Each structure stands twice: as structure tokens, then as C-alpha cells.
Amino acid sequence: MKTGVFVFDVMTKQPISVYKDKNLADCANLMEKKDVNSLIIKNENNKVLGIVADEDFIRKAIAKNVDPFKTKVEEIMATEVITIEPDKDLYDAVKLMGDYNIRQLPVVENHKLVGIITVKDIIKVEPAIFEILSGKIRLKTGDKPDLIY
């Protein structure tokens, strides 16, 4: 079920990212300031090393009572990062998000970070896809009972 909309049409082209040695307090402040739910961790060559989401701060930092000023983001980031290429169909991004239960995908081209696509980005352009992501696909009743929306 391709949409005809590509990842590069929807993605945020300048994602918020940090280097792995940034402390958790600085990362949390940056996320608050930029109003984002995740940060991409990259190296000097713009290669994605990991990702940290707001729930990582809760499960891996707050719950374990770590010092946010002494703990580096590399200590709590997810290193097995699911990514997508900018020329993929939006449906492919939605499928990956659903399959891996994630809310964001770093967009990479030639192993370099070029953007990020989030559930919020997708909902802005294709609100109906939200129902797919949230697992609430329902059979529409009426004249055409086989129509899914």
C-alpha cells in the first residue's frame, strides 16, 4: 500500500542532534528548548551512532537515579538504530515504526544523517496513517463494508 509520498517530502531536514559525550542534563534541556521527543547521537562525520528518546531518560536515568550532570548520553542511548532512506515511500516509514514500536526514524543517505521523520510529521501530511500507527484500523460500516480507513 504505497502512498506516493516520499520520506524526503515529510522529514525534518535539520534534526536536533548531539555528540555522544553530551551530559543528560544538557540533552534534556535541549529537548525541552527545541520541543522534541528524541535526539540523534552522531559523530563528527554526521554518522548516526544512536538515538535517545524521552522514555530513555525515564527508564535508564531517572529510574536508576543517575547524576544527569555526570552521565553522558552515550550511556543511555539506543545503539541499534532503525533508519530509513529519503527516497522511500511514506508507507515504508509507517511500517518500520509499527514493526519496531518506535516514534521516529533517522533519515540517512550514504551513511550520513540528512533528516528525521516522526509520527508527528506523518500525521501532519497524512492523518489517516495515524490509525495504522496506533493499531486502530477499523472496518468502515455503510454502503461499502469492505472499505478500510
Please report, for each region that a protein language model flagged, where it lies by residue.
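Tandem CBS (Bateman) regulatory domains
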Residues: M1-Q14, A53-G98, T118-Y149
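Short, flexible active-site loop motifs that bind/organize anionic cofactors or intermediates
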Residues: Q14-S17, K47-V48, T83, K112
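The conserved cystathionine-beta-synthase
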Residues: S17-D35, K42, I84-N101, V108, ...
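A glycine-centered beta-loop-beta connector
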Residues: M31-K34, L39-D56, M97, L105-K120
